[in-house]
Amino acid sequence: MKYRRQHKSLFCISILGPFYFLLLQCFSTVTASNYAATYNPTDTIALDCGSTGNSTASDGRAWTGDIGSILATLQPLDTTIAARAIRQGPVEGIPYLTARMSSSQFTYTFLVSAGLKFVRLYFYPSWYPGFDRSKALFSVKSGPFTLLSNFRADLVADSLGLEYFVREFCINVEENQLLNLTFSPSPSSSNDSYAFVNGIEIVSMPHNLYYTPAGADGIPFIGQTYFYEIENITALETMYRLDVGGHSISPTGDSGMFRFWSDDNQFFMGGGVIPDKANSTIKYTKETPAYIAPAEVYQTSRSMGPNKTWNMRNNLTWVLPVDLGFRYLVRLHLCETNRAITQVSDRQFIIYIDGEMVDEAADAIIWSGGNSIPAYRDYLAMIGFEGTQGKYNLSIDLHSRAGFSVYVDAVLNGIEIFKLNSTTGSLAGPNPEPPKTIFLNEPSQLTIKGSSNKKTTFIAVGVIVTVGLVLLSLRLYTMFRRQRESKDHGYKLKFTETKASLLPWEVCLQFSKAETKEVTHV
């Protein structure tokens, strides 16, 4: 990592905006169509763990089984097994139908070209023959980086309310270097832990997609006076990739790298009108080529609406839980598609990240150079102190800039957040707390035979319903108390009418910004 001191000239952009805009118009001699092509990755590996031969997923993508595959070697082979889940939930099929499992360490080795790669690990934490769902406890390492540690896939899936999920990382591979992924069961008191994986995907990415290009200043470090360079010796973990105001975009709908974009509904806390979908043709540029984000991200957005009085009192707000003790790359995507907005200062607004003002005059026309031209801005945030544990609600707030803007409004198209590895090379965060619900046993133990068990069944159902009502009452009480407490402090509620969050991470330990500063003295 490298640091560069921030230059004061950056803060003059709002003053020099009109001149900056004219310069962009004068010197933009290359048409946007030259940059509209999707990215063609050098390496595209999709390994269906625990299966053999070639298969096609529901989205049309080809997957190769790891048994006898030329794409990867598996060592040691004799201590692992290929398994199919005892109970197949509502999964999409490949690569979740089979898994590679072992009670001892195993390593996949991939021969790939040098450069930065997406590494995606697919998990379907179910019951497999001889393996208890709750006993999967393991770590995953790649070179000097710890991607996962003491990882409980079942807790992650349950906290998300999902049957299956993907973890995505960004890792650099040096020249003449192999890419290794080592899965190691964690020690447990019962000595019956195991590691598993359902699928592994490796896709090349452009060298400057998320990393600082050579010779560039880096990105603003929030709360500091210097820039931060993200070098290729850094590993990243994708925390969020959101199509703001839109819907989820499948990997095949991405611009060449098979990234998944989620909608922002779960994380948007209010302050905006109905999401907007524009019919504009997105004009990609050298600074923002098509591989940065698909056109659909820039065609959808959230804005505040036409009520100036209401807009002056409120924010557009997103709250995204992250792990304490790490640095985060926060990327905001912006594209002005309102045909009435074509000039500098037509729509300017203030951006806050984690309560800190990072841009006092954000303007899509200044950022990009014109209407329907996409742009993005990166910021670095340090959340807590390295070594601290728990969850933290990272906030992004946009507030209108009344008196300096024709439209008293704010707008945003997309959000991406990435975790940077710690000084020890770790990206691993804590597991979610076990959900406060009643889990059924392994399917083979669920059978109830004979009429003599009917009374037992009715009693069990009654107990479950009663416990559920008690937990619901406690949940509603907690929400009500939090809402009352939140009115007494915090800059966000000065402008924003928020709605209660039902995020699964709320069962984890969370701290406010003030509490974090008090503990860490930062």
What are the roles of these predicted feature ranges?
Residues 2-521:
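Compositionally biased, intrinsically disordered or flexible polar/acidic segments
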